[in-house]
């Protein structure tokens, strides 16, 4: 049997999630699967009648995690479950949905095919890093999409010295700097004119946000290196600077603080229904104006 124990995870703030989650739980039970509901999802979405589990229990026992919500919901679930190796499948109950690629109305059909073994798996990298003040580590976190260093208030720019494996790259004056994974290259990085990286690439991309020097362009680097970014100045920034690991924020950066970023030792495994195509997702989500040929598989 494929995926005998399935965990359900939903976006806590979403209204109206109880009905589709309950229907999904019923469908899974009828298919002979044991269903676990993540604790906050059960509490806030009102899903009852199924065993409730915290992240650790899900990580130790679940063979598949079904995440209903937007990409942000998947990011949070992925950070929790990546160390356990639990694969995830995303059902879009949000907005754009690059990671939650299954529309809500197709959830039962798509999940049914996956449970029958008609699926393809895709491994993606995470980032890990921290904030150092001298020899003391002030903060640590992981990120699926990106690590973003930016000014926290109005006015002025931040100045950052960037090194890769100890080799000086540049000193950047900008509103911010994005370090994105291939997964994150279609998120904030894309809106800052960064390139799209194929998810199979072993790479990261550094994208400046409103740099002072217009010749400062995004640069793609191997994910095998360690980035060190030292905040050298904050100009006339009124409040300070912050660093964000996905949606996790450290907002007390001071001049001289060092931010380290590198590839995490574990990966995320996403499960897609058979026939999934990254390029098809790009065409749909970004509305690329292609002239398809009759032989093209568009979906």
UniProtKB/Swiss-Prot annotation:
Record bears the keyword Metal-binding: no
Entry GO terms, CC: cytoplasm
InterPro entries noted in UniProt: ATP-NAD_kinase_N, ATP-NAD_kinase_PpnK-typ_C, NAD/diacylglycerol_kinase_sf, NADK
Subcellular location: Cytoplasm
Protein family membership: Belongs to the NAD kinase family.
Cited function: Involved in the regulation of the intracellular balance of NAD and NADP, and is a key enzyme in the biosynthesis of NADP. Catalyzes specifically the phosphorylation on 2'-hydroxyl of the adenosine moiety of NAD to yield NADP.
Protein name: NAD kinase
Gene, per the UniProt record: nadK
């Amino acid at each position: 049997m494929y995926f005998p124990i399935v965990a359900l995870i939903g976006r806590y703030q979403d209204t109206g999630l109880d009905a589709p989650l309950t229907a999904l739980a019923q469908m899974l039970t009828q298919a002979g699967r044991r269903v676990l509901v993540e604790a906050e999802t059960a509490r806030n979405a009102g899903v009852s009648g199924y065993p409730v589990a915290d992240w650790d229990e899900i990580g130790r026992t679940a063979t598949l995690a079904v995440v209903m919500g937007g990409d942000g919901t998947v990011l949070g679930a992925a950070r929790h479950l990546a160390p356990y190796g639990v694969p995830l499948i995303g059902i879009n109950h949000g907005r754009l949905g690059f990671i939650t690629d299954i529309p809500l109305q197709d959830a039962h059909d798509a999940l049914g095919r996956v449970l029958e073994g008609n699926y393809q798996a895709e491994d993606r990298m995470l980032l890990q890093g921290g904030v150092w003040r001298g020899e003391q580590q002030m903060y640590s976190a992981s990120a699926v999409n990106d690590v973003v260093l930016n000014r926290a208030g109005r006015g002025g720019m931040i100045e950052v010295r960037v090194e890769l494996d100890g080799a000086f790259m540049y000193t950047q004056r900008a509103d911010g700097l994005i370090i994105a994974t291939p997964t994150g290259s279609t998120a904030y990085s894309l809106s800052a004119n960064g390139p799209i990286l194929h998810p199979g690439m072993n790479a990261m991309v550094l994208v400046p946000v409103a740099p002072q020097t217009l010749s400062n362009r995004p640069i793609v680097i191997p994910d095998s290196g360690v980035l060190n970014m030292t905040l050298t100045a904050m100009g006339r920034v009124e409040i300070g600077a912050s660093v964000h690991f996905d949606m996790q924020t450290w907002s007390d950066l001071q001049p001289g603080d060092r931010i380290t970023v590198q590839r995490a030792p574990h990966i995320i495994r996403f499960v897609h229904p058979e026939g999934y195509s990254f390029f098809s997702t790009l065409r749909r989500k970004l509305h690329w104006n292609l002239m398809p040929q009759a032989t093209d598989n568009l979906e």
